[in-house]
Amino acid sequence: MKVKAAPRAKARLTSARRTGARGFTLIEILSALLVLSLLALMSYRGLGAVLDAREHTRYETDKWRRVAAFYARFERDVQLAAPRPVRSTTATGSGVSPAWRGEASATEQSRLEFSRFAATEGVDTARRIAYRLNEKNEVELWLWPGLDIAPDTLPARYPVLAGVKTFELQYLNPGLVWVNVWPSSPTDPPIPQAVRLRIVLASTEEIVRIFALQS
């Protein structure tokens, strides 16, 4: 004998089946889209921050690599400074330039200029060189072809460090006093005891280094 389900139980079963087959409502779909949009935005911002950080790290690494290379070059040059004056000849006459001639601020109008021995590895010759800060905020290296050169011979100029606001030098005299020009008196030796170089980068970092010179 078959047992028939009660009408109330049958209604509950039909309602449950309808509820299980019901799709998402519009509000649920919009809520899901909003959550997905927020997740995508957060992911995009996170990726952008990572890329920005990587670019900043690359820029800083390159900047300090260039600064380190410049200081290495400057140190090598000043430690090869030669206590040898040079003959200077121009259209107005001839004279002698001191072995080391320096001012406090090596700008476009002034510069650090000195005689330099040949490099020990034989890759360069004895010559007159100079450093100065040009109008483009670049430290320039000037290279003359030798020591005693022909009249009005112009040096080759090479930018060796960009993005420099300040390029200042001081020189240590035999009394262990820092002076702003060299030679500062007729009794000064051809080369100072040391040179102090202060650089301020365009990004505001300040670097000060002291280089002992060969006496």
Regions found by a protein language model. Name each.
Residues 42-147:
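Extracytoplasmic beta-strand-rich oligomerization domains located immediately C-terminal to a leader/signal peptide
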Residues 1-2, 18-47:
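N-terminal single-pass transmembrane signal-anchor helix
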Residues 123-128, 155-157, 205-208:
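Short, mixed charged/polar active-site loops
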Residues 161-215:
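Short linear sequence signals and composition-biased patches located at protein termini or domain-edge surfaces
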Residues 122-125, 151-152, 162, 190-192:
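Short solvent-exposed loop/turn micro-motifs enriched in small/polar/acidic residues
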Residues 145-159:
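Short aromatic-glycine motifs in intrinsically disordered, low-complexity regions
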Residues 5, 11-17:
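Short, low-complexity intrinsically disordered segments enriched in A/P/G/S/L with frequent Arg
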Residues 24, 129, 195:
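Residue-level detector of short, conserved catalytic/binding motifs and their immediate flanks
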